[in-house]
Structure formats: structure tokens, C-alpha cells
């Protein structure tokens, strides 16, 4: 009796169980391929491609990266490039940024193709900015006119006039 009951259940739902077991393998393949797609760029040498990234900053944001300590790629939770201890110059306003952490979030397909590099957003963390009083207005205008996303975390602004500190905003 028990054997008959087991056979009827097995025969009745066998197509459903086969489909569920097939989905299990399909999800495993999908998960492995996505994780490999995100992890493999961590082995690339971004020091060789620095000119392409610097050129993108210059064209899109009017930012000139003059110095940095190193570039690292981090895949999780969101793929990003991290520059440490970076010195950046705003070209039109002559503002000098000293940034401890510059995070660039590239678009998904521009992780592999750095010739057509595009970033979805940029985060500047722990910034020190030195501005002259004459360049303050142009600096504010340039930041407000940017079409691409740029975020500042922990921004310290020093406004200087004739080598004297006028205002320090933290």
C-alpha cells in the first residue's frame, strides 16, 4: 500500500520535480557567471590605464588628477575604483583638492572597456579644498553646472585671500 502511494506521487509530479532540479543548476550557473564577471577586473592593472581614466575626468568633470597613491578595484557590494590620497585640481576655478578616498563607480560594461570609460557617480571622501576669494564664485558655479553626479563627504573648505585664512568651513 505504501509502495503504491509512493509510486503515484513520484509519477504524478516527476515533470515538476525535474523542472525544479533543472532550475537549481541554472541558478548556480547564473550566480557563478555574475560573480566572475564582477571579480575578474580585480586582477587588472589599472596603473597602466591611468591615462584613460584621467582623460575621462578631464573631459567630463574638468578635474585634473595630478597625484595619487594607488588605484584599487573593489567588486562588492557595487563595483568601484578607489584612488587613495589623491590631489585634484578644478581647472576653471583653480581649486586644489586633497582627497583621501576618491571612489569612482563605473558603468557595468565600462569595467572591461576602459577605452570608452564612463562613470555613473563619483564620491570624494575626506576632502580639503583651498580656494582664493576671487575663485570661490566660479567654483560654486562649476559644481552646480556639472551634469554628472559628484558627491562630497566630509568637505573642508578654506577660503584664502592674500595668504591669509578668511573662512574655514568644515
Named regions from a protein language model:
Residues 1-61:
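N-terminal type II signal-anchor transmembrane helix
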Residues 26-30, 64-65, 87, 157:
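Aromatic-enriched hydrophobic runs in primary sequence
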Residues 62-70:
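A short, amphipathic edge element
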Amino acid at each position: 500500500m505504501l509502495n503504491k502511494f509512493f509510486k503515484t506521487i513520484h509519477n504524478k509530479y516527476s515533470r515538476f520535480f525535474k523542472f525544479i532540479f533543472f532550475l537549481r543548476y541554472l541558478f548556480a550557473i547564473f550566480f557563478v557567471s555574475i560573480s566572475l564577471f564582477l571579480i575578474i577586473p580585480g586582477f587588472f592593472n589599472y596603473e597602466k590605464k591611468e591615462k584613460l581614466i584621467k582623460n575621462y575626468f578631464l573631459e567630463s568633470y574638468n578635474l585634473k588628477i595630478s597625484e595619487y597613491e594607488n588605484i584599487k578595484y573593489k567588486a562588492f557590494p557595487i563595483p568601484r575604483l578607489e584612488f587613495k590620497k589623491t590631489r585634484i585640481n578644478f581647472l576653471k576655478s583653480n581649486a586644489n583638492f586633497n582627497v583621501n578616498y576618491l571612489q569612482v563607480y563605473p558603468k557595468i560594461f565600462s569595467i572591461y572597456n576602459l577605452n570608452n570609460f564612463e562613470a555613473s557617480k563619483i564620491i570624494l571622501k575626506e576632502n580639503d579644498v583651498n580656494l582664493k576669494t576671487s575663485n570661490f564664485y566660479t567654483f560654486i558655479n562649476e559644481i552646480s553646472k556639472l551634469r554628472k553626479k559628484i558627491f562630497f563627504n566630509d568637505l573642508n573648505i578654506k577660503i584664502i585671500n592674500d595668504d591669509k585664512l578668511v573662512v574655514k568651513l568644515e
